[in-house]
Design a protein with these regions (language model features):
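Secreted/periplasmic proteins
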Residues: 2-114
Length: 114
């Protein structure tokens, strides 16, 4: 009985951790554009600055996020970065423009996994 109780507690803990990770949150975001347009991304695709993609240091390629600032946009992780300070997400110019992030350029955005 004791082992079953511990197993149930461990399972509940894992479920709560998994659901909180998948829930989303906020992160410091920036955008990148012209200089990288047409170059190869970390996953081998050609970067399209007008597309709705993003770079993240560790999320798996293909991960889809709904990113919100003044509006919301769905993006797919296809590159690595950003590598400047505390920034965690680098949106394509098109995605940043869709949510109103091109000016100021860097700010906290909210996100959820989709």
């Amino acid at each position: 009985m004791f082992i079953k109780s511990i197993s149930a507690i461990a399972a509940a803990a894992l479920l709560s951790v998994g659901s909180s990770v998948q829930a989303g949150g906020s992160m410091l975001s920036s955008w990148y554009g012209g200089y990288f347009h047409g170059r190869t991304t970390a996953n081998g695709e050609t970067y399209n600055m007008y597309g709705h993609t993003a770079a993240h240091k560790s999320l798996p390629f293909g991960t889809k996020l709904r990113v919100c600032y003044q509006g919301c946009v769905d993006v797919r992780i296809n590159d690595r970065g950003p590598y400047i300070g505390a920034r965690e997400l680098d949106l394509s110019y098109g995605a940043a423009q869709a949510i109103g992030l091109t000016h100021p350029g860097v700010d906290y955005v909210s996100f959820t996994y989709i």
